[in-house]
Amino acid sequence: AGKTTTAGKLADYYRKRGLKPGLIAADTDRPAAYEQLEQLADQADVEFYGEPNAENPSKVVERGLKELDVDVVIVDSAGRNSLDEELKEELSEVNDVLEPDQSYLVMPADIGQSARDQAEAFDEATGITGVIVTKMDSSAKGGGALVACSTSGAQVKFIGTGEQLGDLEVYDPVNYVSDMLGQPDLESLLEKV
């Protein structure tokens, strides 16, 4: 889905707007996640906390919150297409420690039919407040994200439009629908009608 890259993009987004973000590597399932997030933090010039061989993500988050001196904390947690009970419990524990203001579900534009089940499970574990749709630069239209929003009651907040740190845009529903319909500028079209 591009979850770790999206965490780096969010950090870059907030830094460019005058805030001091920090990244916490709490994905203890994917071996390369720690290194990837550390590199992204370096590229975005933001604080980073992680423990390369950690096994308990909620403990990593707890220690990271004490170590980082930032305005915005962004946690890269584990994620999989199918959410098993173990991962739901893990995410719930991280959520309890973090007590986040925002909890984003990151989904690729091409997710399709599994979006509903994934959104329900993540919402149950963390209380989704927003959806970030990645890979909008592909041929996929992102309809699954709309299903996820309908299921969780959350709104799309951002869209990822490429692989670079700056390739994150605030969601604009008019542009989103225009892209889905293959219309480059729906607003102008509506004005003509």
Segments the model singles out, each with a brief description of its role:
Residues 1-192:
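P-loop/Walker A NTP-binding module and the surrounding RecA-like catalytic core of P-loop NTPases
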